[in-house]
Amino acid sequence: MFEINPVKNKIIDLSDRTSVLRGYLDFDAKVERLEEVNGELEQPDVWNDPDKAQALGKERVSLEQVVNTIKNLEQGLEDVDGLLELAIEAEDEDTFNEAVAELDELEQQLEKLEFRRMFSGEHDACDCYVDLQAGSGGTEAQDWTEMLLRMYLRWAESKGFKTELMEVSDGDVAGLKSATIKVSGEYAFGWLRTETGIHRLVRKSPFDSNNRRHTSFSAAFVYPEIDDDIDIEINPADLRIDVYRASGAGGQHVNKTESAVRITHMPSGIVVQCQNDRSQHKNKDQAMKQLKAKLYELELQKKNADKQAMEDNKSDIGWGSQIRSYVLDDSRIKDLRTGVENRNTQAVLDGDLDRFIEASLKAGL
């Protein structure tokens, strides 16, 4: 005879957790809003404003994910309960095993939805930019920056996010001095925001003829793409705008005409670059968007600086904090904030970052 009570208890537990999520995620309001959004998208003139239409489409996907998952969970738990009763009446082990398997599947769906509670930040739902900058270590650090770029592109691809290479600056011998990518998709900034910081690589350098161990650093800075409605005042007199010919490692995807744009914000020293379009005008518009987003994120960080400075156990804001150590000779990658380790270094460098990211989000970093 099969064990019934643990399965019944699990059904009750999952039902309770679904009910809690229903309230936390404001299910009824989302159902109502989904109807409104669908109504707006059915209007024949909706595409007269493409930006608004795209924003509505994005909102619909997000709403449908919550609404459909909760509906599926509630219906699925009801179905499993019925299946379990049938198994008990007929004393049918195959039906019982089917009920258990379906219950496990529902639990996975629920856990994914529960994880969304980690994305409670104001801009977590936004698309974002990831700036990578080679630190000390010369060619080794520049090669490391290119490895990080590949890692984040692979990770984004595995999550179904869209990526655009906004700017790339070649290293002196190999690798990259800097790169900026845009990551678009649901909760892109929420997923990546804890990746800001210094990434440290320790390995036997392929650029050292004596095969010595080298330590090099590369910095990542993640910031959200902000809504055009958010007003960021930028004085044109504070800007230095340079145009140049793109010469990055983007191959056919990077233009070779003198249409790349670099904007320097003199008061803050922030530099943004864009070279992913053949049009200088479009590159300038995109660079201004990046500048606004970066200034906004830095302003938010300044506001939080005083509060965080009081908490000694928390890392410094911005570029100064070392977050992860990649020791390739020892086959060990360790997050210095959460203690999470992964010895499959190649998998991590191929984009297997979820364990690190999920742990940092759960830790409230």
Swiss-Prot record:
Species per Swiss-Prot/TrEMBL record: Haemophilus influenzae (strain ATCC 51907 / DSM 11121 / KW20 / Rd)
Protein purpose: Peptide chain release factor 2 directs the termination of translation in response to the peptide chain termination codons UGA and UAA.
HAMAP family: Rel_fac_2
Protein name stated in the entry: Peptide chain release factor 2
A Gene Ontology cellular-component term: cytoplasm
Further information: The gene for this protein contains a UGA in-frame termination codon after Leu-25; a naturally occurring frameshift enables complete translation of RF-2. This provides a mechanism for the protein to regulate its own production.
GO biological process, alphabetically ordered: viral translational frameshifting
UniProt record similarity statement: Belongs to the prokaryotic/mitochondrial release factor family.
Alphabetically ordered keywords of this record: Cytoplasm, Methylation, Protein biosynthesis
GO molecular function ontology, one term from the record: translation release factor activity, codon specific
Main location: cytoplasm
Compartment(s) of residence: Cytoplasm
PTM sites of type N5-methylglutamine: Q252
Record-linked InterPro entries: PCRF, Pep_chain_release_fac_I, Pep_chain_release_fac_I_sf, PrfB
Pfam families associated with the record: PCRF, RF-1
Reported modifications of this chain: Methylated by PrmC. Methylation increases the termination efficiency of RF2.
